[in-house]
């Protein structure tokens, strides 16, 4: 998706915790830690790098243990595998801070979990149809009470510089993943800790719960099931055999099956290593038995197995077709028993008809039913914007990923619509009952590598869709951003609210861009921003009725140093009269490590 490293879009820019500093390797010599960093890592971790890797100042905010974990089992194993254990530890201690701060004993919950208000849950990324709409009864917030929101508690994530996990609220608890792979079960009202679990790699998705279990994936392509009450592992499996497969979209759970989207970081390595044989990864959706983790079916978004297509200029084999990652949570059409997924670009030639598309699979068998492509011949990877373009496909196109989830809604009278949006700034209304026939299309945003629509919109029960605009422009922090409201039936623009002038001007990583996902309740839409603000908009007019700046230090309930930063891939979660948001997105944005919980008057 051409996203920050693994995210789904502009890999290099938007993925905090997704950056993959895979620099060219040189023969191992007896080098000091500083020399090791300069020869192995500085190529990617420098100002203006093409992959959005964090700069040394950001790395120094991480614990050395977190850096070591990234080198040994996480997102930097590509470079870590070329180092000896002693070298990995030396680089980690050279870059990182002292030991991660432990969670205070006083932050442990003293009582067993209590059930939340009936129906006051937000389970996973969104409902089956990906509307990201919370009805009034479950929201517990209104147009009148939203302006009264105040911070109730803050929770700090230890040793990390990104907090990109979107919280799930279920039975009075918060389930959220962290960049270091820790999954937390917290009390929704107080933030105290019930349990933690250490996954193999970072967890950037929203966990989904069902049948007493919590399900999630990590940035090494692993999928997990834990006992929701205790955090004990029930099963763990690989969603894909490719070593560069990652899970960046939340799974969907229905009728005993877990549907998992699979994306990959092939395109990032292609940018940093011309000797890499680009590219062999294929996106997919995998159906697993939720009870056992056994694979039921696997549906690839590239139907043909990649084959050798030649050599690049340094003699490395080239492969294709490839790519077409599924970056986001799939949409379940429970009426038609169909699963819809948005796809990204081809990483190498030849291009396919399933890239930059909505693809539809049969929920029972995984059979491809149809594909509706919006941008054809879009072969692209990060080498196309890097210093060394060896692995850039011939005649690359525009990187117009459809990296967010389609929104399925009824229009009445037996008619339905599936709304899709992409990085080119286009929004489409499709007929899901006529193989994705285009009902309408609108050019809303300027688009670009980090432009257009990145992480997804929302739709309420009034026939309106709300989408946040990115249009990030490097070096121009006041450019980009905005929230737009469209009529579902026609695509007519009802209103647009431009992004306010950023208050973070002068801070590295500041931008007015608003690539974050939207959440909507009756009368109010919530949207975060690259500038670190979380805002509430009146849905009738687009007027901003509440605004909170997260770029500040917080007193955390678990005693850790906590600070907010950019809000990019993380979505607001509303349930039981509270609003939850994580803040911090390192790389080219502003780092942070905090989960914030708001309630009316802070009560």
Predicted feature residues:
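Repeat-blade elements of multi-bladed beta-propeller folds
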Residues: 119-127, 160-184, 200-223, 246-277, ...
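Extracytoplasmic electron-transfer domains, predominantly the class I c-type cytochrome c fold
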Residues: 43, 51-99, 338, 578
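Blade/loop signatures of beta-propeller domains
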Residues: 108-152, 301, 306
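Sequence/structural segment immediately N-terminal to covalent heme-attachment motifs in c-type
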Residues: 31-47
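Surface-exposed loop and turn segments in beta-propeller and other repeat-based domains
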Residues: 155-157, 238-241, 296-320, 368-397, ...
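Electrostatic cytochrome c docking/interface patches
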Residues: 25-36, 110
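Beta-propeller blade signature
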Residues: 227, 281-293, 354-367, 480-491, ...
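Bacterial N-terminal signal peptides
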Residues: 10-27
């Amino acid at each position: 998706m051409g996203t920050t490293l693994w995210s789904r879009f502009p890999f290099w820019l938007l993925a905090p915790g997704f950056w993959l500093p895979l620099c060219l390797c040189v023969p191992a010599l007896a080098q000091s830690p500083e020399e090791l960093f300069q020869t192995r890592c500085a190529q990617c971790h420098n100002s203006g790098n093409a992959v959005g890797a964090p700069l040394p100042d950001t790395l120094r905010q991480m614990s050395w243990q977190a850096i070591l974990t990234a080198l040994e089992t996480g997102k930097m194993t590509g470079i870590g595998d070329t180092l000896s254990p002693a070298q990995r530890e030396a680089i980690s201690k050279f870059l990182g801070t002292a030991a991660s701060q432990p969670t205070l004993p006083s932050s442990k919950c003293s009582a067993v979990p209590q059930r939340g208000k009936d129906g006051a849950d937000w389970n996973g990324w969104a409902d089956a149809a990906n509307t990201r709409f919370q009805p009034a009864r479950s929201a517990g917030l209104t147009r009148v009470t939203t302006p009264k929101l105040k911070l109730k508690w803050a929770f700090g994530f230890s040793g990390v510089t990104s907090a990109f996990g979107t919280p799930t609220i279920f039975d009075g608890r918060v389930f959220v993943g962290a960049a270091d792979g820790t999954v937390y079960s917290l009390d929704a009202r107080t933030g105290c800790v019930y349990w933690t679990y250490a996954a193999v790699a970072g967890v950037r998705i929203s966990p989904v719960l069902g049948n007493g279990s919590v399900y999630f994936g990590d940035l090494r392509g692993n999928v997990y099931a834990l006992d929701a009450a205790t955090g004990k592992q029930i099963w763990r499996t690989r969603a894909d055999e490719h070593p560069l497969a990652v899970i960046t979209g939340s799974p969907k759970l229905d009728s005993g099956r877990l549907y998992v989207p699979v994306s990959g970081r092939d395109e990032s390595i292609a940018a940093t290593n011309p000797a890499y044989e680009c590219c062999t990864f294929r996106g997919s959706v995998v159906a697993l038995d939720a009870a056992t983790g056994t694979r039921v079916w696997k549906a690839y978004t590239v139907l043909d197995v990649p084959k050798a297509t030649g050599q690049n200029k340094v003699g490395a084999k080239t492969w294709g077709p490839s790519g077409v990652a599924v970056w986001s949570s799939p949409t379940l059409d429970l009426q038609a028993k169909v699963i819809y997924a948005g796809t990204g670009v081809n990483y190498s030639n030849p291009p396919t008809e399933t890239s930059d598309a909505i693809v539809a699979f049969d929920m029972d068998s995984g059979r491809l039913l149809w594909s509706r492509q919006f941008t054809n011949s879009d072969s692209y990877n990060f080498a196309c914007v890097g210093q060394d373009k060896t692995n850039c496909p011939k005649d690359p196109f525009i990187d117009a990923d459809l990296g967010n989830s389609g929104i399925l809604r009824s229009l009445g009278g037996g008619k339905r619509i599936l709304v899709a949006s992409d990085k080119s700034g286009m929004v489409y209304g499709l007929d899901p009952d006529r193989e994705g026939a285009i009902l309408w299309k609108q050019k809303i945003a300027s688009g670009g590598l980090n432009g257009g629509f990145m992480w997804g919109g929302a739709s309420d029960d009034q026939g309106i869709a709300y989408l946040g605009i990115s249009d990030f422009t490097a070096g121009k922090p006041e450019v980009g951003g905005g929230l737009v409201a469209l009529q579902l039936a026609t695509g007519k623009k009802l209103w647009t609210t431009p992004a306010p002038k950023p208050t973070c001007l002068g801070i590295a990583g500041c931008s007015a861009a608003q690539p974050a996902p939207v959440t909507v309740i009756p009368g109010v839409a919530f949207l975060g921003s690259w500038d670190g603000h979380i805002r509430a908009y009146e849905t009738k007019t687009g007027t901003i009725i509440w605004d909170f700046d997260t770029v500040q230090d917080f007193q955390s309930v678990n005693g850790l140093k906590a600070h907010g930063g950019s809000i990019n891939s993380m979505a607001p979660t509303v349930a039981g009269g509270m609003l939850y948001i994580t803040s911090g997105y390192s790389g080219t944005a502003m780092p942070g490590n905090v989960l914030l919980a708001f309630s009316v008057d802070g009560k």
